[in-house]
């Protein structure tokens, strides 16, 4: 008896999610993204069992994505998810001969990096804004300093707990639940101390058992969306570049490379599983070097 397509979708997506969590060690956010992509594939290509999956079903899916004029990066992400899904089906002996996935060629965009001067200006903004309440100014200054000093992802920042912070380093839990120690600069440590007492103490009175480092004014763990929104607003005061919390991670890595830091050390601090993810910053640093050369070489003046 053939299983109804909706029941098949639900069952196979649950099994796939378990595979991503246990075998691949992915976080819930990544698993949700994979589920969404595969759910789209199953629906668009009218898949009601593994036997329905063929090269043609992949073409149907890809054509629909092209018809929707999805961005190249989105298209590539969906096809990568499809490739992982097929590997899962093969591993479960549900699809012995998976279709071939051809990835579209993508121009890998280099991140637009803040200069050290722009970072310094950004770090100073919260305390300079007259209408910014002092408790928010000190909290947000500590957030900005921590992001730039350590290069952590905004999700990792929000997950930091009081016990994860010492005088000269922080303990970070990154992708795949992997833990790493990252040095904490003295200016960042000073900014955190200035926030902890009295401002964080005031927040915690509303929620005494909360032990996350960065709290909302109601005493709860700070949400990533809040960090993104506040940094975006601060950045508008000092630069026309698009700035997000990840911009400070880019700046952290690029400025370290500019100052001759070892690429492998940067890889460890960023929590990259592959060195290729870190190598993108060598291209950013090289572009910066070329710009300086063109600006200062006598033949170009």
UniProtKB/Swiss-Prot annotation:
**Cellular component GO terms, alphabetically?**
cytoplasm
> Keyword Lipoprotein on this protein?
no
Chief location category: cytoplasm
Task: Tell me the ranges covered by the Core-binding (CB) domain, including all copies.
Answer: 7-90
- Coiled-coil stretches: none
In terms of InterPro entries, this protein maps to: CB, DNA_brk_join_enz, Integrase-like_cat_sf, Integrase_catalytic, Integrase_recombinase_N, Integrase_SAM-like_N, Recomb_XerD, Tyrosine_recombinase_XerC/XerD
What does UniProt list as catalytic? 153, 175, 246, 249, 272, 281
Question: PROSITE patterns attached here?
Answer: CB (PS51900), TYR_RECOMBINASE (PS51898)
Task: Give UniProt keywords alphabetically.
Answer: Cell cycle, Cell division, Chromosome partition, Cytoplasm, DNA integration, DNA recombination, DNA-binding
Query: Where in or outside the cell is it found?
Result: Cytoplasm
User: Which is one Pfam family of this protein?
Assistant: Phage_int_SAM_1
| Tyr recombinase domain segment(s) | 109-294
| Cleavable signal peptide | none
Q: Which GO terms describe its molecular function?
A: DNA binding; tyrosine-based site-specific recombinase activity
CDD domains from the UniProt entry: INT_XerDC_C
Single biological process term from Gene Ontology: DNA transposition
Functionally, this protein is described as follows: Site-specific tyrosine recombinase, which acts by catalyzing the cutting and rejoining of the recombining DNA molecules. The XerC-XerD complex is essential to convert dimers of the bacterial chromosome into monomers to permit their segregation at cell division. It also contributes to the segregational stability of plasmids.
Q: How does this polypeptide assemble, per the annotation? A: Forms a cyclic heterotetrameric complex composed of two molecules of XerC and two molecules of XerD.
Membership in a protein family: Belongs to the 'phage' integrase family. XerD subfamily.
Q: What protein name applies here?
A: Tyrosine recombinase XerD
Annotated source species: Chlamydia pneumoniae
The lineage is:
Bacteria, Pseudomonadati, Chlamydiota, Chlamydiia, Chlamydiales
């Amino acid at each position: 008896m053939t299983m109804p397509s909706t029941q098949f979708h639900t069952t196979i997506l649950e099994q796939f999610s378990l595979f991503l969590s246990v075998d691949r060690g992915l976080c819930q956010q990544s698993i949700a993204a994979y589920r969404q992509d595969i759910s789209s594939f199953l629906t668009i290509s009218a898949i009601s069992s593994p036997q329905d999956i063929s090269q043609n079903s992949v073409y149907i899916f890809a054509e629909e994505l092209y018809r929707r004029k999805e961005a190249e990066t989105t298209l590539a992400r969906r096809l990568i998810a499809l490739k992982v899904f097929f590997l899962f089906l093969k591993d479960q002996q549900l699809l012995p001969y998976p279709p071939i996935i051809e990835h579209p060629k993508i121009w890998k965009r280099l991140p637009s990096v803040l200069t050290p001067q722009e970072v310094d200006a950004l770090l100073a903004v919260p305390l300079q804004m007259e209408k910014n309440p002092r408790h928010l100014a000190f909290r947000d200054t500590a957030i900005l300093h921590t992001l730039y000093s350590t290069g952590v992802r905004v999700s990792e920042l929000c997950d930091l707990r009081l016990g994860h912070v010492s005088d000269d380093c922080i303990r970070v839990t990154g992708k795949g639940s992997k833990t790493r120690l990252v040095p904490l600069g003295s200016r960042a440590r000073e900014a955190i101390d200035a926030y902890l007492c009295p401002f964080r103490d005031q927040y915690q009175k509303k929620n005494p058992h909360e032990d996350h480092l960065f709290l909302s004014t109601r005493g709860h763990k700070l949400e990533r969306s809040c960090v993104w929104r506040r940094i975006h607003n601060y950045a508008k005061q000092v630069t026309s570049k698009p700035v997000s919390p990840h911009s400070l991670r880019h700046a952290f890595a690029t400025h370290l490379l500019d100052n001759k830091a070892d690429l492998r050390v940067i890889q460890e601090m960023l929590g990259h599983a592959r060195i290729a993810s870190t190598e993108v910053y060598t291209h950013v640093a090289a572009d910066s070097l070329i710009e300086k050369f063109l600006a200062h070489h006598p033949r170009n003046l």
